[in-house]
Amino acid sequence: MRRFIELCRSRNGKIALNVASAVLGIGVAILAARHFAATGWPLANADFQLVGAAGGFFLLSHAFKAFGWHRLFAPSQRPHKMALAAAGGAAAVGGAALPGRFDDVVRVAVVRRFGASDSCVGTVCLSLFMLGLIDTAALMPLASSAAATSDSSVGVRAGMGVVAAAGLASAIIISLLPRLVASGRLIRFRVARWLAERTTTTREAWKALVFVLASWVARAVGLFFLLAALGVSVSFPLALAFLVAAAASAALPIAPAGAATQAGAGAAILVASGIGTSQAIAFAVAAQAILIAVAAVVLVVAAAWGTARRFRPARVAV
């Protein structure tokens, strides 16, 4: 592994990685072009009022996620909410090309780029770890509802049950972590003291969980409107199943481009639920395209806010 990392850091390794990424991107673009040439653009015959409603709920989900992430920092180290929104938008846009889990690197870089707080890289990484736990915990009620109300196969319901169980385990960790790092037996260790200074309280973690749950619900409502806009189905349980499958695939440690992985998982769950393969792929691609477009809007607005703030004249005390 060490040799592989050293090879990737070398000049030839970087060139090879860039070439491989370019070839992969061109290959995906060619396959997508062939697919759309044969089947047509998914949004060509969509109800654009419903598409607009879906985009609005996707935008709302970004806001809720930024508010939730904001709660996971210590009060003295919290970045501005717009910085966190920009990081989320950049990660979603980068997910169209970057491999799975690399979006966290983008988030850290963007938060540090804004430079509006005293958060170090380690603090941002810890907040992302907590955000991952809270994301999983917030999916628990949605996965349980999808498993209970979906007409899918037993295997699909079992998969939803696994996601719900993972959410329960994450909720337990969230509850115990602040007490664990503050334990008298562990506080003498430097790592435990560092964690104790930066780990949010259980109360703040549960507030973050409420915001993140609201973010997932807003996205599920947006997917429901998009299903109706494309004439796929008018089924909220199906929207929940698509959401849970896509979110669960994002947890894979190593995967192709994040957006492609989520689209593939979502399309697979639609096919397993009785939707035609071509229609399922079209919906998954359309959903990811709109999500990326909304994320790009969030990123542009946040970048404009950051630029305006940087050039705003400092207030002079009277």
Question: What annotation goes with each model-predicted range?
Answer:
Residues M1-A90, L139, S144-A251, T277-V318:
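Predominantly cytoplasmic-facing regulatory/coupling regions of multi-pass membrane proteins
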Residues A92, L131-D135:
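Structural signature of transmembrane alpha-helices in multi-pass secondary transporters
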